[in-house]
């Protein structure tokens, strides 16, 4: 299985946010989709603390899906489904056969920074179709605000990402807000997180 130190550091604070935004629904059985699950550390950690959510992890890389399977087996996570191949930049009807209005929550953790803008567009278009009414999309990572990136460590990260791939980089929160609006969602909350990251919470109207 793969190990991400960054995922290990962030999983506790992310869990706290997700539990808080879902606390009013913890009496129901919920269905969650994680886009770009990576190693699988996050999803199994969430599953252990939130048994009321059934999670579907996804990733485009076979190596990552194998790692997710290993974490599921190692933790005996009963509410994490077999990981699927899902490219969020594709139209929603290619999202692993998920029907419209089928998800209560969709997570995109450190996905939008490491992918082209077409992926961000796909995430919001797809979420607008796949989420139930009042369902939530939560994105996490460092962002630009009104074209400005702070602090210096995030500026340096943005430069590094663009050197790796000119189409990568820190997305602007105002651009994401507009993408959400164009796809029947609104940005409901911006939560400050450790290490100069933020959680953005969007709700489907």
From Swiss-Prot:
One Pfam family named in its UniProt record: DUF938
Similarity comment text for this entry: Belongs to the UPF0585 family.
Protein's name according to its UniProt entry: Methyltransferase-like 26 B
The species this protein was found in: Danio rerio (Zebrafish)
Gene name of the record: mettl26b
């Amino acid at each position: 299985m793969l190990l991400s130190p960054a995922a290990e550091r962030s999983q506790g604070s992310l869990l706290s946010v997700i539990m808080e935004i879902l606390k009013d629904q913890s009496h129901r059985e919920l269905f969650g989709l994680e886009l770009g699950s990576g190693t699988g550390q996050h999803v199994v950690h969430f599953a252990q603390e939130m048994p009321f959510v059934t999670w579907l992890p996804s990733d485009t890389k076979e190596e990552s899906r194998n790692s997710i399977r290993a974490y599921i087996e190692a933790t005996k996570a009963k509410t994490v489904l077999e990981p699927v191949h899902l490219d969020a930049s594709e139209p929603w009807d290619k999202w692993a056969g998920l029907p419209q209005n089928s998800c209560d929550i969709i997570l995109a953790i450190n996905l939008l920074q490491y992918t082209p803008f077409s992926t961000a567009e796909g995430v919001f278009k797809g979420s607008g179709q796949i989420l139930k009414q009042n369902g939530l999309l939560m994105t996490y990572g460092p962002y630009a605000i009104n074209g400005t990136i702070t602090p210096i460590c995030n500026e340096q990260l943005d430069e590094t990402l663009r050197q790796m791939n000119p189409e990568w980089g820190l997305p602007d929160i105002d651009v994401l807000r507009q993408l959400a609006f164009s796809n029947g969602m609104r940005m409901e909350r911006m939560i400050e997180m450790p290490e100069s990251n933020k959680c953005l919470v969007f709700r489907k109207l």
